[in-house]
């Protein structure tokens, strides 16, 4: 349980060791973290340093326990330290950590991915960013075209050409979204609103025969959770193919999270290329991209498009990924879906009792909260809400032992490991959290 004694962090939990380690971390690491969202920048307060985890529970360095509704941003389908995954990793590491040569496990993981999705061939890489970067390069190499089209609010890793925000107008050249990215690097990136199929058509009309690919999250999870509307992905595929372009669906987040077959299991759209991450690694650093064989065969050494990686197909990560996919049966997904429905209901009931305008955004078992009436369909909708209510809501949950995503624009993830006791703890924590959200002012 969380120690509710006062602490100098401004929270009601004892987080003295997290404070100590965060101050030390800032001496050696920019901002004290290795990925920005971990710093609690958008919600304020003290980031928790996690010591260990099991099942649905995170335990920080001060001994505080939390019900985990982040699941390492998606991959922990069955909770932390799942016995089958740990056994596979432990069995593999005694034979070596990395060989820089082909292994049987690489072939077997590729087969596992192919058997559950629409892709015909797979290349293993080390991160979701690397997967999307490689897929875009491959699309450009295959089509011999320079431009790419992406959607405002969709995140595809920190690739220079994809880390771009929308400028003005319906179909527009992108503006760099970070210092260090030049206009030249985003000049060939077109950004349009998500779920706006007419904006996509307008972009292709403005740049006929120039767009190599459309890249989109299969279901958006980085502007909050926003599901594709009205057969959006299907229309994207048709528009791309009519112009000779490709469709890349980014399933780094949704792949093997939203169903046994990922988002492909939801809408059955056979994209030309698909990127995977998170679940395919079992929580270790690994990812993949795949697609139609004629496109994938453009990759070196078979074709001219270069892509490589010393640690790609790392045997330990491959073992974890295979074990995770194997253990994630259809029954596991039914449990995850039911748990997401249960969490949805608890959050909505608590906010309704306090009169807080809200909509629970859903994409299968992924969810987030929009603090406004009605469903958000794009990034503008998600920003046009009472986002100021989220920080006090988040901290009340955290102080009562519930670990939610530390940003209103991040997706909540549940595991099959959640118990009735966990849901009771969540329900209890939602009482002060909803009150805090109701009392918040801009």
UniProtKB/Swiss-Prot annotation:
Q: Which family does it belong to?
A: Belongs to the class-III pyridoxal-phosphate-dependent aminotransferase family. HemL subfamily.
Q: Which HAMAP family match?
A: HemL_aminotrans_3
Organism in which the protein naturally occurs: Corynebacterium efficiens (strain DSM 44549 / YS-314 / AJ 12310 / JCM 11189 / NBRC 100395)
Q: Where in the cell is it found?
A: Cytoplasm
Look at the named UniProt entry and state the broad enzyme category this protein falls under: isomerase
Q: What is its EC number?
A: 5.4.3.8
| Quaternary structure and partners | Homodimer.
> Which GO-annotated molecular functions does the record name?
glutamate-1-semialdehyde 2,1-aminomutase activity; pyridoxal phosphate binding; transaminase activity
GO biological process, alphabetically ordered: protoporphyrinogen IX biosynthetic process
Which cofactors are required for activity? pyridoxal 5'-phosphate
The record's listing under SUPFAM superfamilies reads: PLP-dependent transferases
UniProt xrefs under PROSITE patterns: AA_TRANSFER_CLASS_3 (PS00600)
Modified residue N6-(pyridoxal phosphate)lysine is at which positions? 278
Q: What is its main location?
A: cytoplasm
Q: Which UniProt keywords apply?
A: Cytoplasm, Isomerase, Porphyrin biosynthesis, Pyridoxal phosphate
Instruction: Report the GO terms under cellular component.
Output: cytoplasm
User: From what superkingdom does this record's organism come?
Assistant: Bacteria
- UniProt catalytic activity: (S)-4-amino-5-oxopentanoate = 5-aminolevulinate
Gene, per the UniProt record:
hemL
What pathway or pathways are given for this protein in its record?
Answer: Porphyrin-containing compound metabolism; protoporphyrin-IX biosynthesis; 5-aminolevulinate from L-glutamyl-tRNA(Glu): step 2/2
> This protein is called what?
Glutamate-1-semialdehyde 2,1-aminomutase
